[in-house]
Design a protein with these regions (language model features):
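Hydrophobic structural segments characteristic of membrane proteins
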Residues: 21-148
Length: 148
């Protein structure tokens, strides 16, 4: 049986709030790449994505916002891996390369806004577009770096 607050937490997709305990005991950060699932470590933390493992895992980041607002549209794992995962991986790398105190504050605010948009049944198109821009900026940076 799920209590009413459990249904609300699931609807707003904030059912991971118990991870605040991990933040309080220092094993997680508020902002940082999401922890990698055991079956996805090779994909999410291998190759050029290995940089994501150099910072503490967090409750929110650009990639978790991308997954939050866009990822649930693809229940099929294959489609998710094709349309959502590549951007998520680029956003994790982007976060590590651009991490800052004020950037983390902005991500916390964006996370609250994403939850509010979801609660109101709205889609944060502006956030979607900005996250794609960040991922493309990281891709452009990598291409330019590899060409030099």
């Amino acid at each position: 049986r799920i209590f009413w607050w459990g249904r609300v937490m699931r609807r707003l997709k904030i059912d991971e709030l118990p991870q605040l305990i991990n933040i309080l005991n220092g094993t997680m950060s508020i902002v940082g790449p999401r922890p990698a699932a055991a079956d996805q470590v090779e994909i999410t933390r291998g190759g050029e994505n290995a940089i994501a493992a150099t910072v503490p895992c967090g409750l929110t980041s650009q990639s978790s916002l991308w997954d939050y607002i866009y990822g649930d549209q693809f229940p099929d794992e294959e489609e998710y891996n094709e349309k959502v995962l590549p951007i998520r991986l680029k956003l994790d790398v982007y976060y590590v390369k651009h991490a800052s105190f004020f950037g983390d504050i902005k991500l916390i605010i964006w996370t609250v806004l994403a939850i509010l948009y979801t609660a109101c049944g709205k889609y944060p198109q502006w956030m979607h577009e900005k996250l794609v821009d960040y991922a493309n900026e990281n891709l452009d940076h990598n291409l330019n770096h590899n060409l030099n």
